[in-house]
């Protein structure tokens, strides 16, 4: 059984017991979160596609960690102008473990 749900402007295909990284959610570690934006639920040959969401569909997850991704470097460079700009960024993310798929 798997489901496709929406969180942080992205779609995620998950199965029960899977760990997935999402955009940062303001929750404590160990908290339970429910996602109602379920786009599709599949159980074998039985596929339920929402329009746009599955009625009664729910993905339940537990927050495992709140962390930051590795640093990426952004470089802007203009040739022959002695102009160079460099910046770095670390994006926050929330790692959740899927504990249940209902629907």
UniProtKB/Swiss-Prot annotation:
SUPFAM superfamilies per the record? L21p-like
Question: What cellular component terms from Gene Ontology apply here?
Answer: cytoplasm; ribonucleoprotein complex; ribosome
Q: Which UniProt keywords apply?
A: Ribonucleoprotein, Ribosomal protein, RNA-binding, rRNA-binding
PROSITE patterns, sorted: RIBOSOMAL_L21 (PS01169)
Q: Does the keyword Ribosomal protein apply?
A: yes
* InterPro entries assigned: bL21-like, bL21-like_sf, Ribosomal_bL21, Ribosomal_bL21_CS
Pfam families reported in the protein's UniProt record: Ribosomal_L21p
The record's GO molecular-function terms, alphabetically, read:
rRNA binding; structural constituent of ribosome
Domain of life the protein comes from: Bacteria
Q: Answer yes or no on keyword Ribonucleoprotein.
A: yes
Which GO terms fall under biological process for this protein? Answer: translation
Function statement: This protein binds to 23S rRNA in the presence of protein L20.
Q: Per its UniProt record, what NCBIfam families does this chain match?
A: L21
Please describe the quaternary structure of this protein: Part of the 50S ribosomal subunit. Contacts protein L20.
Entry-linked PANTHER family: 50S RIBOSOMAL PROTEIN L21, LARGE RIBOSOMAL SUBUNIT PROTEIN BL21M
Similarity annotation: Belongs to the bacterial ribosomal protein bL21 family.
Protein name (Swiss-Prot/TrEMBL): Large ribosomal subunit protein bL21
